[in-house]
């Protein structure tokens, strides 16, 4: 009798362990479960173009950090291409994105700060990029560039650029699987996304620079980021002045 009880308990524990493993697997590998957190106001972006006029080699050769921009507005297609290059879906069957991610945990959240009269077809404000719908979620109204620049130690190119792309991260999406080493993976992924942005901007005749010098708490408060999202990059983008 005691032996039978032990066998039954072993079977039960095996089933429970399998259920937990399956639950964890689908928690880690279903980035589509990350739902928008603020509003139902979405702006659909035009489909990204996958056949450009500049080769990867030429984009690498031409890539530079640009800090001076004209006042010419960006188009929705420009923003569509940039956000797709950073975090867009490139394999809808498996929810894979343009930038590689450790274990497909996808910790990054991407936003854009749009200035007044800085884009055709898009009002000033803060928007969150939804990769699965390839659309923008309107989060905040108003031109936040001056406040953003102030929180970034007064770097004027942030205020002068038509738009600023913000890359933030939810570390727990990756550290839940990889522990402390996941922090490194998150930072690597942010670099992958930023390099994609550089090359896409270059291919479209745009200029940008990555900024890492800012007060984290001020950026978090200004953009009203959820407490689990930490800002990693501010990236001003515009038409190069020269």
Language-model features: locations:
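Short coil/turn connectors at secondary-structure junctions
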Residues: 160-162, 229-230
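Small-aliphatic-rich amphipathic alpha-helix that forms the alpha element of a beta-alpha
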Residues: 63, 82, 110, 163-173, ...
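Short, small-residue-rich loop/turn micro-motifs
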Residues: 49, 167-171, 239
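N-terminal amphipathic, basic helical "cap/leader" segment at the start of enzyme domains
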Residues: 9-13, 21-161
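Short, low-complexity patches enriched in S/T/P/G
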Residues: 1-9
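A glycine-rich helix N-cap at a beta->alpha junction
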Residues: 224-242
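Conserved hydrophobic/aromatic beta-strand scaffold that supports enzyme active sites
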Residues: 126-128, 164, 234-236
């Amino acid at each position: 009798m005691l032996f039978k009880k032990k066998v039954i308990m072993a079977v039960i524990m095996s089933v429970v362990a399998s259920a937990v493993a399956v639950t964890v697997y689908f928690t880690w590998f279903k980035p589509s479960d990350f739902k928008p957190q603020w509003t139902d106001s979405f702006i659909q972006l035009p489909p990204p173009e996958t056949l450009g006029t500049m080769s990867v080699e030429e984009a690498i050769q031409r890539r530079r950090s640009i800090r001076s921009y004209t006042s010419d507005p960006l188009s929705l297609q420009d923003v569509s291409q940039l956000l797709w290059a950073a975090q867009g879906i490139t394999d809808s069957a498996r929810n894979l994105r343009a930038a590689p991610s450790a274990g497909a945990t996808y910790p990054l959240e991407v936003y854009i700060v749009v200035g007044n009269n800085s884009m055709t077809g898009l009002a000033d404000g803060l928007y969150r990029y939804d990769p699965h719908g390839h659309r923008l979620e309107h989060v905040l109204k108003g031109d936040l560039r001056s406040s953003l620049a102030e929180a970034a130690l007064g770097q004027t190119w942030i205020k002068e650029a038509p738009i600023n792309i913000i890359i933030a991260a939810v570390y727990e999406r990756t550290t839940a699987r990889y522990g402390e080493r996941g922090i490194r993976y998150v930072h690597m992924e942010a670099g992958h996304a930023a390099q994609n942005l550089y090359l896409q901007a270059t291919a479209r005749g745009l200029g940008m620079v990555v900024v890492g010098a800012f007060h984290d708490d001020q950026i978090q408060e200004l953009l009203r980021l959820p407490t689990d999202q930490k800002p990693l990059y501010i990236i001003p983008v515009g038409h190069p002045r020269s």
